[in-house]
């Protein structure tokens, strides 16, 4: 299977290309190969071999900012960019019958609706987090949400590196949605609670709040704290290396292939039953 990777200068885009090239060198059956590497418009790295760019061996795939030029070179597109760019890639893939793996976060309700409509024509695996651990955590939280009435407060704490733009994280929103049984709900910022570089978010009509921290080079940490008088239940996930998200995205691309149509998530890919 030939994969296209967008946002090649970003943390995830670069890591995905590195992983594909590394895996290509050791694959016997060539389960996947790099077919295209796509950068933002007018990027000064266009024309450079993707392998050279990620400090690996040359692969004969040259970075481009024009996806039209490489549409015949890939089967599935992996996108971890920005919301507006993702929408452009979704429209392109629908027009050209290409399946997608989307890990872009910070998507609005209207953008999520675009993805849902597109999935009636192409196959899309969309997730705010491609780690196995988070997928299992969400399964556990399905049970916790059923007993949430026994706790006085439920809080979500998420920490990421100081370059991450979206606050709160897409994973934190997903966690809250699982607990609330509300998919793709909005998050409201209470500016009165902003202090010391920490922003606290929460819907105005319930007691579930999201606390977001941006500091240093934290890959990703998410905790759910269920508290009552005298006790606390905490469920926590820590990501120590970005490679867990990369491997989840690649596994999703292989699972999705060219033939599947519909909207899927990592739970569909992993087939976890709890």
From Swiss-Prot:
<protein>
    <recommendedName>
        <fullName>4-hydroxy-tetrahydrodipicolinate reductase</fullName>
        <ecNumber>1.17.1.8</ecNumber>
    </recommendedName>
</protein>
<keyword id="KW-0520">NAD</keyword>
<dbReference type="GO" id="GO:0008839">
    <property type="term" value="F:4-hydroxy-tetrahydrodipicolinate reductase"/>
</dbReference>
<dbReference type="Pfam" id="PF01113">
    <property type="entry name" value="DapB_N"/>
</dbReference>
<comment type="similarity">
    <text>Belongs to the DapB family.</text>
</comment>
<dbReference type="InterPro" id="IPR036291">
    <property type="entry name" value="NAD(P)-bd_dom_sf"/>
</dbReference>
<keyword id="KW-0028">Amino-acid biosynthesis</keyword>
<keyword id="KW-0560">Oxidoreductase</keyword>
<keyword id="KW-0457">Lysine biosynthesis</keyword>
<feature type="binding site">
    <location>
        <begin position="7"/>
        <end position="12"/>
    </location>
    <ligand>
        <name>NAD(+)</name>
    </ligand>
</feature>
<keyword id="KW-0220">Diaminopimelate biosynthesis</keyword>
<comment type="subunit">
    <text>Homotetramer.</text>
</comment>
<keyword id="KW-0521">NADP</keyword>
<dbReference type="GO" id="GO:0019877">
    <property type="term" value="P:diaminopimelate biosynthetic process"/>
</dbReference>
<keyword id="KW-0963">Cytoplasm</keyword>
<dbReference type="GO" id="GO:0050661">
    <property type="term" value="F:NADP binding"/>
</dbReference>
<dbReference type="InterPro" id="IPR000846">
    <property type="entry name" value="DapB_N"/>
</dbReference>
<feature type="binding site">
    <location>
        <begin position="170"/>
        <end position="171"/>
    </location>
    <ligand>
        <name>(S)-2,3,4,5-tetrahydrodipicolinate</name>
    </ligand>
</feature>
<dbReference type="InterPro" id="IPR022664">
    <property type="entry name" value="DapB_N_CS"/>
</dbReference>
<dbReference type="InterPro" id="IPR023940">
    <property type="entry name" value="DHDPR_bac"/>
</dbReference>
<dbReference type="GO" id="GO:0051287">
    <property type="term" value="F:NAD binding"/>
</dbReference>
<feature type="binding site">
    <location>
        <position position="40"/>
    </location>
    <ligand>
        <name>NADP(+)</name>
    </ligand>
</feature>
<dbReference type="GO" id="GO:0016726">
    <property type="term" value="F:oxidoreductase activity, acting on CH or CH2 groups, NAD or NADP as acceptor"/>
</dbReference>
<comment type="function">
    <text>Catalyzes the conversion of 4-hydroxy-tetrahydrodipicolinate (HTPA) to tetrahydrodipicolinate.</text>
</comment>
<feature type="active site" description="Proton donor/acceptor">
    <location>
        <position position="160"/>
    </location>
</feature>
<dbReference type="GO" id="GO:0005829">
    <property type="term" value="C:cytosol"/>
</dbReference>
<dbReference type="InterPro" id="IPR022663">
    <property type="entry name" value="DapB_C"/>
</dbReference>
<dbReference type="GO" id="GO:0009089">
    <property type="term" value="P:lysine biosynthetic process via diaminopimelate"/>
</dbReference>
<dbReference type="Pfam" id="PF05173">
    <property type="entry name" value="DapB_C"/>
</dbReference>
<feature type="active site" description="Proton donor">
    <location>
        <position position="164"/>
    </location>
</feature>
<comment type="pathway">
    <text>Amino-acid biosynthesis; L-lysine biosynthesis via DAP pathway; (S)-tetrahydrodipicolinate from L-aspartate: step 4/4.</text>
</comment>
<feature type="binding site">
    <location>
        <begin position="127"/>
        <end position="130"/>
    </location>
    <ligand>
        <name>NAD(+)</name>
    </ligand>
</feature>
<feature type="binding site">
    <location>
        <begin position="103"/>
        <end position="105"/>
    </location>
    <ligand>
        <name>NAD(+)</name>
    </ligand>
</feature>
<feature type="binding site">
    <location>
        <position position="161"/>
    </location>
    <ligand>
        <name>(S)-2,3,4,5-tetrahydrodipicolinate</name>
    </ligand>
</feature>
């Amino acid at each position: 299977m030939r994969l296209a990777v967008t946002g090649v200068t970003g943390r995830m885009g670069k890591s995905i290309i590195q992983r594909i090239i590394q895996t290509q060198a050791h694959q016997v059956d060539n389960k996947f190969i790099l077919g295209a590497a796509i950068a933002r418009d007018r990027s000064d790295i266009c024309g450079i071999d993707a392998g050279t760019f990620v400090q690996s061996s040359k692969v004969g795939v040259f970075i481009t900012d024009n996806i039209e030029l490489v549409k015949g070179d890939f089967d599935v597109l992996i996108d971890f960019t920005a919301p507006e760019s993702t929408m452009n890639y979704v429209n392109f893939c629908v027009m050209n019958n290409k399946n997608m793996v989307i890990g872009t976060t910070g998507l609005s309700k209207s953008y999520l609706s675009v993805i849902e409509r597109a999935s009636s024509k192409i196959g899309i695996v969309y997730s705010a987090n491609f780690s196995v651990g988070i997928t299992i955590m969400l399964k556990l939280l399905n049970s916790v949400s059923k007993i949430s009435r026994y706790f006085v407060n439920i809080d979500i704490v998420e920490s990421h590196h100081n370059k991450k733009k979206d606050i709160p994280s897409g994973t934190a929103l997903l966690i809250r949605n699982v607990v609330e049984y509300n998919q793709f709900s909005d998050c409201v910022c209470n500016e009165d609670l902003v202090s010391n570089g920490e922003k606290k978010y929460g819907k105005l009509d319930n007691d579930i709040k999201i606390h977001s921290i941006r500091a240093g080079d934290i890959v990703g940490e998410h905790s759910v704290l269920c508290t009552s008088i005298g006790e606390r239940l905490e469920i926590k996930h820590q990501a120590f290396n970005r490679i867990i998200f990369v491997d989840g995205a690649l596994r999703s691309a292989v699972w999705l292939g060219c033939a599947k149509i519909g909207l899927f998530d990592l739970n569909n890919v992993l087939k976890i039953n709890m």
